[in-house]
């Protein structure tokens, strides 16, 4: 643990199209080398592509996908008497969102499609349908928590 006091959380500004702070966080996560306008272009183009592919509003698919990705439980390492246990703990709301966004961008980049717009659109559609690599990551996290349920009484 750090001996300093906790860092102040800086609030992000809502994005221009949807006026949503979560969208801004996803755009910031997609962004590489500080090129925010390119990241915005990728995200908004992916939303348009989703609407074109599914016929539903891209923003609604995005919201559903993010809700499906958010983990309720995760495992945390806890050292007790020379042994390290993976202790299942509930995830706070802000960490749920952070993990969901992190997993989304990580597994979007790992996809095989050509171009980030296609990758992001495909991963969001898959996640909205409870499919894809991000949902698999969430399920793997749940399996780890279930396997280590015996250590749940060790609070982290």
Swiss-Prot record:
| Keywords, alphabetical | Ribonucleoprotein, Ribosomal protein, RNA-binding, rRNA-binding, tRNA-binding
- List the Gene3D superfamilies: Ribosomal protein S7 domain (1.10.455.10)
Identify the CDD domains for this entry: uS7_Bacteria
Q: Looking at the record's lineage, which domain of life comes first?
A: Bacteria
Q: Name one GO biological process term.
A: ribosomal small subunit assembly
Q: Name one GO cellular component term.
A: ribosome
By its UniProt entry, which SUPFAM superfamilies does this protein fall under? Ribosomal protein S7 (SSF47973)
**What does the similarity note say?**
Belongs to the universal ribosomal protein uS7 family.
Give the protein's recorded name: Small ribosomal subunit protein uS7
